Amino acid sequence: MSKTFLRPKVSSTKVTDWVDPSFDDFLECRDVSTITATSLGVNNSSHRRKNGPSTLESSRFPARKRGNLSSLEQIYGLENSKEYLSENEPWVDKYKPETQHELAVHKKKIEEVETWLKAQVLERQPKQGGSILLITGPPGCGKTTTIKILSKEHGIQVQEWINPVLPDFQKDDFKGMFNTESSFHMFPYQSQIAVFKEFLLRATKYNKLQMLGDDLRTDKKIILVEDLPNQFYRDSHTLHEVLRKYVRIGRCPLIFIISDSLSGDNNQRLLFPKEIQEECSISNISFNPVAPTIMMKFLNRIVTIEANKNGGKITVPDKTSLELLCQGCSGDIRSAINSLQFSSSKGENNLWPRKKGMSLKSDAVLSKSKQRKKPDRVFENQEVQAIGGKDVSLFLFRALGKILYCKRASLTELDSPRLPSHLSEYERDTLLVEPEEVVEMSHMPGDLFNLYLHQNYIDFFMEIDDIVRASEFLSFADILSGDWNTRSLLREYSTSIATRGVMHSNKARGYAHCQGGGSSFRPLHKPQWFLINKKYRENYLAAKALFPDFCLPALCLQTQLLPYLALLTIPMRNQAQISFIQDIGRLPLKRHFGRLKMEALTDREHGMIDPDSGDEAQLNGGHSAEESLGEPTQATALETWSLPLSQNSASELPASQPQPFSAQGDMEENIIIEDYESDGT
């Protein structure tokens, strides 16, 4: 064997005296005297572990030589450790903003947050309750940094909530849990919600502890919550109760920061619905992604400083590479700085993209003005991924806008291919976007995207013939996804037909120079299908509960039987049946039917799935396999059913008729009578 292999074995007897066994107290092995490693300074700095001898090698020398270091060696090691830390410190922490002027946030957003802090903290009334602020925005747009910098400049303390980790088990805890002499075993545990409530109570009641370097000359403070306990995502009602209580007893403002998610999980709508925001008077400030121009200035500043300081140790990127990096990070300046540091390190030159020659086909098809834009844009999307850019995602509002406005690139008259004369009506300019990629980047099911498209496409057309053609494409797409046997296979084709059909049918927007339908902004709305489908299910359950003797399907019951019962003069003893028949079987005496109230779609809202349809419901839009065949499922029990508000009101009945009562009580009464008759026989 080699000496290197035997060296650890020789010094192993020395090392055992430095180690304190973990279970010596539990096993009651106290015969061996041990020495703690911390008291003798075994935990050296990273510099001493790197440059000095190893623990096994140094154990062969006397302890006197190992402990006595000259002052020159100590100073040299301290300076080297500081230099090592400064070189390896992340640039995100190294160049973090310290003042308002260094923030990569729009000035109006900074003024909006500063105005709220002045009104709720600096100008706060003595007996004013707890005020709540909700800050939303994409990751890396400067939400938390803005709050901390403004609080520091105005002398406001910040008490931040951090999710606690489970405490480590100690020896005494281990003994108490597995004590053989006791029949009771206690596991020390406290839920995160209980800890969060206790934190809010203590933070609003007591001041922050003064640590070394803190200046606590003011009693003004705020509570900052960015990482909520995970239990609130499963049970949001618990958070709502905490917010209601804090508004009553809180003594300082409470700020929540939630990052927008493009994966479909809308935490803002789950944790802070509109009802809670109105009830608790929660202010809402929404941050935008960092603009590429502002991000470019910050990256140039970092590159200039690092190039002057470490000229030969980093690779200085050019302007084109920085522009690609800014576009690929989707407004996340934190991700941009991290990617810049990683790509600028020595030996990572191949990570910076280099443009290749464009195809001759694209040069011939596109005009000179568009020839420089579109190939660069397509190539940029491929290059940014090599630098480590984020996946480009779209909110629903922007995704619908790209389909409905359908911008196109103009073609040259000579080189562009032309259709035959008998097909000239189908000729269009080239689209600037791929509809399938737009739907994919929206992170929405294709059927749900078709619902939003069907709700909003009419306002973007000018000719009725184009609307008819677009509706045919939407109907054909709905047929493809109608059968549950083939829905999973044809879903992508259905979405492609719907999006491309709507874009192709709009002749007013068929060419790049056309301004069909005007270029003005048009609001988008949520589908009315959800409300109508919910009303249909309520009527279905009501009809099955009130008319069980007819044994008819829901479609026949509501289209063939109930309308005729409303015209007959047969008296009925059940007041609930009378109210339901008048609600379903008679149309209101109005000459002009008003449209249903439409709910506007905001620019940062995700696709809404009907909450009553269940998690397993897939959209043909939103129903399960059984519902797509014609009737809703019986998942909702009849015992939990109640009449809708419009059917349970007494204002729709004539004065001679008795007032309707709950159908559930009538069902219970019938059951009791049947049980009584069966006992008598």
UniProtKB/Swiss-Prot annotation:
Give residues where Phosphoserine occurs. Answer: S71, S86, S359, S646, S656
Residues with Phosphothreonine modification: T55, T633
For the motif RAD1-binding motif, give the residue ranges. 17-25
Q: Which residues does the record give as ATP binding sites?
A: G137, P138, P139, G140, C141, G142, K143, T144
The answer, when asked if Phosphoprotein is one of the entry's keywords, is: yes
Task: Extract the InterPro entries matched here.
Answer: Checkpoint_prot_Rad17_Rad24 (IPR004582), P-loop_NTPase (IPR027417), Rad17/Rad24_fun/met (IPR018324)
- How does it associate, per the subunit comment? Part of a DNA-binding complex containing RFC2, RFC3, RFC4 and RFC5. Interacts with RAD1 and RAD9 within the 9-1-1 (RAD1-RAD9-HUS1) complex. Interacts with RAD9B, POLE, SNU13 and MCM7. DNA damage promotes interaction with ATR or ATM and disrupts interaction with the 9-1-1 (RAD1-RAD9-HUS1) complex. Interacts (when phosphorylated) with NBN; promoting recruitment of the MRN complex to DNA damage sites.
PTM statement from Swiss-Prot or TrEMBL? Phosphorylated. Phosphorylation on Ser-646 and Ser-656 is cell cycle-regulated, enhanced by genotoxic stress, and required for activation of checkpoint signaling. Phosphorylation is mediated by ATR upon UV or replication arrest, whereas it may be mediated both by ATR and ATM upon ionizing radiation. Phosphorylation on both sites is required for interaction with RAD1 but dispensable for interaction with RFC3 or RFC4. Phosphorylation at Thr-633 by ATM in response to DNA damage promotes interaction with NBN and recruitment of the MRN complex to DNA damage sites.
Q: Which GO terms describe its molecular function?
A: ATP binding; chromatin binding; chromatin-protein adaptor activity; DNA clamp loader activity
Compositionally biased tracts (Acidic residues) = 666-681
Query: This protein's superkingdom?
Result: Eukaryota
Region ranges (Disordered): 42-63, 606-681
User: One GO BP annotation here?
Assistant: mitotic DNA replication checkpoint signaling
Gene name of this polypeptide: RAD17
Give the species.
Pongo abelii
Q: Where is the composition biased (Polar residues)?
A: 631-662
Task: Give the CC-aspect GO terms.
Answer: nucleus; Rad17 RFC-like complex; site of double-strand break
Query: Where is it localised?
Result: Nucleus; Chromosome
Under what name is this protein listed?
Answer: Cell cycle checkpoint protein RAD17
Q: Where is this region: Interaction with MCM7?
A: 432-681
Keywords of the record, alphabetical order, are:
ATP-binding, Cell cycle, Chromosome, DNA damage, Nucleotide-binding, Nucleus, Phosphoprotein
Family to which this protein belongs: Belongs to the rad17/RAD24 family.
Function as written in the Swiss-Prot or TrEMBL entry: Essential for sustained cell growth, maintenance of chromosomal stability, and ATR-dependent checkpoint activation upon DNA damage. Has a weak ATPase activity required for binding to chromatin. Participates in the recruitment of the 9-1-1 (RAD1-RAD9-HUS1) complex and RHNO1 onto chromatin, and in CHEK1 activation. Involved in homologous recombination by mediating recruitment of the MRN complex to DNA damage sites. May also serve as a sensor of DNA replication progression.
Q: What residue range is the signal peptide?
A: none
Q: Which PANTHER family does the UniProt entry name for this protein?
A: CELL CYCLE CHECKPOINT PROTEIN RAD17
NCBIfam families noted in UniProt: rad24
Lineage of producing organism: Eukaryota, Metazoa, Chordata, Craniata, Vertebrata
